[in-house]
């Protein structure tokens, strides 16, 4: 059964029994340029353009702080957390977000499959025409989860691997999902303890035609775990980042202008829900708005007022440089300083120096690899 999704005067239909099967109406098809292939990103751009105002089209939801793993670099794990959502408790919130045009949702944690009502919540999202991506460690993907995903396939499943036991459930789950026709992305968080496993995990993914990403960036969260102390550094970090960004990194012909606040697409079309059901733009943004008691509409209204106040404000300390891809600075990662003249948005002290130093080491390493000793 197809589910109609409507935003303003445009509509499309979704088949919940497929990972991503959309049928666009004539207005939306024309707006997208009559392309044979339409990305979800382009679809959301078109919906925002047609609506003429921001809409919560994309949801990232950290459903729980609990996890069945004990990684020493986790930014969110807190197994004392007792606020896992129940289907009945979050239904009004989800109904409202969906009614405003929600296109896709990403369910994460902690480990989202620990949530008792995960199947009911997932089924409701899918049967409402939402495209759902799952972030998981894969260890809880059993026969029941596979049956659910076979009936109502997710848009994609991203499994983060933490060891090289290729007979363990996470790896077997990745193969089972792929055999169901579900897109699987293998991921690996590079810490000092686990760095030696990167190559073998990457080879396994390549052998089984599973796309793979790794990330050496660790950051501290709100759970008291000093994740950053586990990060790879020195020459090993240089080598990892050269692999991540490629030998074209730091092209000196690239022009980067100074950053301004909230220029990302997320500011107009994304919402984030914390495990406590607090609303924000993304998980990096520390400013949150409670939905409990006030409901989604009031929290979203207050968030939009804050965004409009700070949108396009210069980020102080950023002059624009060729290390922008490595820098990853944005409003969420900046320091917000209240002053009599309003909120100042500033690059944290020492950030630019740290990024520039790493960027120059990367360019030097790339020149060495190319045999250019300038």
Residue map of PLM features:
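N-terminal pre-core extensions flanking Radical SAM catalytic domains
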Residues: 1-81, 98, 371-374
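Short Fe-S-cluster ligation motifs
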Residues: 93-114, 346-374
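Hydrophobic "anchor" residues
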Residues: 21, 271, 278-279
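Radical SAM/AdoMet-radical enzyme domain recognition
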Residues: 76, 80, 87-219
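Iron-sulfur (Fe-S) cluster-binding segments and ferredoxin-like electron-carrier domains
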Residues: 76-85, 286-291, 324-364
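Short cysteine clusters
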Residues: 67, 71-74, 264, 282, ...
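Short, small/polar residue-rich loop motifs at catalytic or cofactor-binding pockets
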Residues: 8, 264-268
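C-terminal accessory region of radical SAM enzymes
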Residues: 228-258, 278-329, 335-337, 366-369
């Amino acid at each position: 059964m197809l589910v109609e999704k409507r935003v303003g005067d445009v509509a499309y239909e979704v088949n919940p029994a497929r990972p991503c099967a959309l049928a666009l109406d004539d207005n939306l098809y024309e707006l997208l340029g009559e392309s044979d292939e339409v990305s979800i990103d382009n679809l959301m751009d078109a919906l925002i353009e047609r609506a003429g105002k921001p809409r919560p089209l994309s949801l990232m939801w950290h459903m729980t702080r609990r996890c069945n793993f004990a990684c020493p670099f986790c930014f969110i794990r807190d197994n004392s957390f007792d606020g896992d959502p129940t289907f009945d408790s979050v239904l009004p919130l989800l109904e409202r977000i969906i009614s405003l045009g929600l296109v896709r949702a990403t369910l994460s944690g902690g480990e989202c499959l620990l949530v008792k009502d995960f199947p009911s919540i997932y089924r409701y999202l899918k049967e409402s025409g939402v495209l759902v991506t799952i972030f998981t460690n894969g260890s809880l993907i059993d026969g029941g989860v596979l049956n659910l995903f076979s009936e109502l396939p997710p848009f994609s499943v991203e499994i983060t691997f933490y060891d090289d036991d290729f007979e363990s459930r996470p790896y077997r789950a990745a193969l089972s999902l792929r055999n169901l026709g579900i897109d699987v992305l293998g991921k690996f968080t590079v810490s000092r303890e686990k760095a030696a496993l990167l190559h073998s995990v990457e080879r396994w993914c390549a052998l089984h035609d599973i796309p793979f990403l790794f990330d050496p960036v660790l950051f501290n969260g709100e759970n008291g775990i000093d994740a950053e102390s586990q990060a790879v550094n020195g020459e090993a970090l240089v080598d990892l980042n050269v692999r991540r960004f490629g030998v074209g990194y730091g092209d000196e012909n690239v022009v980067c202008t100074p950053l301004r606040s909230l220029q990302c697409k997320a500011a107009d079309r994304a919402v984030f829900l914390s495990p406590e059901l607090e609303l924000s733009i993304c998980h990096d943004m520390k400013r949150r708005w409670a939905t409990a008691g006030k409901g989604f509409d009031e929290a979203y209204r207050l968030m939009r007022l804050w965004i409009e106040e700070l949108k396009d404000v210069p980020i102080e300390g950023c002059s624009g440089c060729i290390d922008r891809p490595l820098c990853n600075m944005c409003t969420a990662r900046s320091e917000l300083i209240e002053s009599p003249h309003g909120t100042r948005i500033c690059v944290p002290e020492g950030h630019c120096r740290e990024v520039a130093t790493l960027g120059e080491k990367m360019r030097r390493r790339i020149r060495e690899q190319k045999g250019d000793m300038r």
